[in-house]
Amino acid sequence: MIVLDTNVISELWKAEPDRAVLAWIDAQMIETLYLSAITVAELRFGLAAMPAGKRRTIFQNRLEGEVLPALAGRVLPFDLDASRSYADLMAQAKTSGKVIGKADGYIAATAVAHGFMVATRDTSPFEAAGLDIINPWEPA
């Protein structure tokens, strides 16, 4: 099972998404793909911070009308198990001299709590958290 990081969803919304990312997404079985509630929060914040207009409306419709319905039942909450994983992985990263941002830490902890990997372009914080990662921008 794979948790999609925010940058994967954002890439799909570009006027010309990276072909490798499109090919990777197309090769996945939809039921193996998940989002973290933190990713949804990041996407919603990004949209709320955009100037009002057609572009923002299009992206809001994509998130609320396409992405979330397609992943219904597969948006993972940040719960008590994730909070335990967060504390452990952030402490381990700090001890190792590695830095993980809070949002990436929450996403990583959610994935760890469920035994999932993360698909992302920004691999370093998730590697620092000890997760198995997939970079859809790179050939397999």
UniProtKB/Swiss-Prot annotation:
Belongs to the PINc/VapC protein family. One of its GO terms (molecular function) is magnesium ion binding. The lineage of its organism: Bacteria, Pseudomonadati, Pseudomonadota, Alphaproteobacteria, Hyphomicrobiales. Residues 2-135 form the PINc domain. Its EC number is 3.1.-.-. It is an enzyme of class 3 (hydrolase). It comes from Sinorhizobium fredii (strain NBRC 101917 / NGR234). It comes from the Bacteria. Its cofactor is Mg(2+). This is VapC ribonuclease Y4jK. Toxic component of a type II toxin-antitoxin (TA) system. An RNase. Involved in plasmid stability. Mg(2+) binds at D5, D104. Keywords: Hydrolase, Magnesium, Metal-binding, Nuclease, Plasmid, Toxin-antitoxin system.
